[in-house]
């Protein structure tokens, strides 16, 4: 971090001489006031806010004036001006972040995506890396390419575990055993370096701190919980931002800055905190933090998506904020598991949350749905009816009577904007996971009888997968593991527990045979994963109690 006394010494004229020494407090990019088209641009105000201030302080007030950020009301006894300079320097943010965070006004094009290789340019070979994956959306976000790298010492960290489990007991003891065996069985990765945590609930944070090594990098997709984790560590271990020069020297905060940790800890943490936002790709540069006796690096998020379509283009702004703000997640669903019932109809009756997806159960099936996605749900006679209603909501000049159920923009108010997916056969319950959105639990009830495949229609560009219900899978597996003294695996070996879905043509009638055909194509180079290939599909689905999860296959 800047040595503030040195940074302010000799500055008498408003120019880049002040700005170049300051990074945006939100995204960590270097500030500049010369080119609005380049990152880090900061708008000059039209007039100075207070000409009576000494020149150094004028410059810093000048920086912040157009962002409506108020000066701290606290002042040190010896030099109040010095404290004001310090606060201002540490709180300057670029125009892009100011508009996005304070006015909720942002252009997605100003938040470009990065690839894994882009981000790895920040990470020296042989470094300690924490691969951050939100457990709530497992296996989405899990990147085998990161875990298999020989040039990095990688640990898997599963965040947001409070959105899957009722308490931290399973998170502490049961998840690591399950994940070790899952990685070995599924990806042939032999590793026991897995932590499941919840930064919001403070689950396993002390264990995590004791484990991670000095100079560790946090690596993952946008909005997976990296910055929230850092802020929890900063609060728990009195951490702060640092700046590391090209020689590796750590520039720690000045004594005046550190003094505030004791005199005004709230303000100190506000200044030091990592930028947490529901906006993806907010972080644009690596930021180092001193946490206890260790250095931790927050890296920008990287994308693995092949689609350039962004959720901001599809989903209503207010709905999207609810989806991304994890602190708004209602944990009562985890404990109570309140379900909604739905019967499959001959007309193609469907269930939706905001129009973000349409779930179509087969005719005659009785289904229970537990929703872990924010927003009210709605059922429609068929998909066409749902799309027609939401199209009216978007085009209506006034308030449509069903507008509270609409979470999509007009750009996807056509059936052609959705992809049709068939869910491979299952018995009992599954969880359907939508990347960066959440998941629902789907349960078929009554005596098993195959009535057809469930379908789900999803906007193009959104990744989806299914899994056996995660909490029950880990709990039952752990019990089996303990009862057999570790002889039985806590992760099932007799069947796949995760799967991708199968895209269908809109007019495909024989979805079961189409699924088998796609399954054979997807496993053509992975023959060891094939199961039941010689069985007739319609005979196979009559015996799911013995032949579980046919045609399940996950494409990493």
From Swiss-Prot:
Its main location: mitochondrion. It is found in: Mitochondrion. This is Genetic interactor of prohibitins 3, mitochondrial. Belongs to the TRAFAC class YlqF/YawG GTPase family. GEP3 subfamily. Interacts genetically with prohibitins and thus may be involved in the mitochondrial lipid metabolism. It holds the Pfam family MMR_HSR1. InterPro entries: G_CP_dom (IPR030378), GTP-bd (IPR006073), Mito_lipid_metab_GTPase (IPR050896), P-loop_NTPase (IPR027417). Keywords: Mitochondrion, Transit peptide. It comes from Saccharomyces cerevisiae (strain ATCC 204508 / S288c) (Baker's yeast). Present with 937 molecules/cell in log phase SD medium. One of its GO terms (biological process) is maturation of SSU-rRNA. One of its GO terms (cellular component) is mitochondrial inner membrane. Residues 113-305 form the CP-type G domain. Residues 1-21 form a transit peptide. Disruption phenotype: Increases frequency of mitochondrial genome loss. One of its GO terms (molecular function) is GTP binding. It comes from the Eukaryota.
């Amino acid at each position: 971090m800047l040595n503030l006394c040195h940074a302010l010494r000799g500055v008498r004229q408003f120019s880049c001489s002040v700005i170049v020494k300051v990074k945006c407090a939100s995204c960590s990019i270097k500030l500049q006031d010369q080119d609005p088209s380049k990152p880090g641009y900061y708008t000059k105000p039209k007039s100075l806010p207070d000409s009576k201030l000494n020149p150094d302080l004028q410059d810093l007030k000048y920086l912040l004036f157009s962002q409506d950020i108020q000066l701290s009301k606290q002042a040190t006894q010896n030099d109040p001006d010095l404290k004001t300079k310090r606060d201002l320097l540490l709180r300057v943010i670029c125009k892009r972040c100011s508009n996005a965070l304070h006015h909720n006004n942002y252009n997605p094009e100003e938040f470009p995506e990065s690839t894994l290789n882009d981000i790895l340019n920040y990470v020296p070979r042989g470094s300690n890396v924490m691969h951050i994956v939100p457990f709530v959306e497992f296996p989405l976000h899990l990147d085998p390419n990161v875990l298999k790298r020989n040039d990095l010492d990688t640990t898997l960290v599963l965040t947001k575990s409070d959105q899957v489990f009722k308490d931290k007991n399973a998170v502490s003891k049961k998840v690591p055993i399950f994940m070790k065996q899952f990685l070995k069985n599924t990806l042939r990765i032999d590793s026991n370096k897995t932590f499941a945590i919840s930064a919001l609930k403070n689950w396993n944070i002390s264990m995590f701190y004791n484990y991670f090594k000095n100079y560790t990098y946090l690596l993952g997709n946008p909005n997976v919980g990296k910055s929230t984790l850092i802020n929890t560590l900063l609060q728990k271990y009195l951490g702060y931002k640092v700046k590391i020069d090209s020689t590796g020297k750590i520039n720690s905060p000045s004594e005046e800055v550190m003094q505030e940790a004791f005199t005004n800890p709230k303000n100190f943490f506000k200044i030091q905190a990592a930028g947490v936002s529901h906006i993806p790709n907010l972080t644009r540069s690596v930021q180092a933090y001193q946490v206890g006796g260790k250095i931790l690096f927050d890296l920008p998020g990287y994308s693995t998506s092949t689609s350039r379509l962004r959720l901001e283009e599809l989903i209503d702004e207010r709905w999207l904020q609810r989806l991304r703000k994890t602190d708004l997640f209602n944990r009562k669903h985890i404990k109570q598991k309140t379900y909604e019932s739905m019967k499959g109809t001959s007309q193609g009756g469907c269930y939706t949350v905001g129009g973000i997806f349409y779930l179509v159960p087969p005719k005659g099936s009785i289904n229970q749905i537990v929703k872990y996605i924010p927003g009210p749900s709605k059922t429609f006679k068929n998909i066409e009816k749902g799309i027609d209603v939401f199209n009216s909501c978007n085009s209506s000049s006034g308030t449509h009577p069903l507008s509270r159920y609409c979470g999509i923009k007009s750009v996807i108010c056509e059936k052609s904007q959705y992809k049709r997916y068939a869910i491979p056969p299952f018995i009992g319950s599954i969880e359907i996971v939508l990347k960066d959105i959440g998941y629902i639990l789907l349960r078929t009830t009554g005596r098993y009888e195959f009535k057809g495949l469930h379908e789900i229609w999803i906007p193009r560009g959104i990744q989806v997968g299914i899994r056996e219900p995660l909490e029950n899978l880990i709990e039952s597996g752990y019990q089996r593991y303990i009862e057999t003294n570790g002889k039985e695996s806590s992760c099932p070996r007799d069947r796949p527990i995760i799967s991708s879905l199968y895209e269908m043509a809109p007019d495909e009638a024989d979805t079961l045979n189409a699924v088998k055909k796609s399954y054979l194509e997807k496993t053509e180079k992975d023959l060891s994963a094939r199961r039941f290939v010689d069985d007739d599909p319609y005979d196979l689905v009559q015996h799911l109690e013995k032949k579980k999860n046919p045609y399940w296959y996950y494409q990493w």
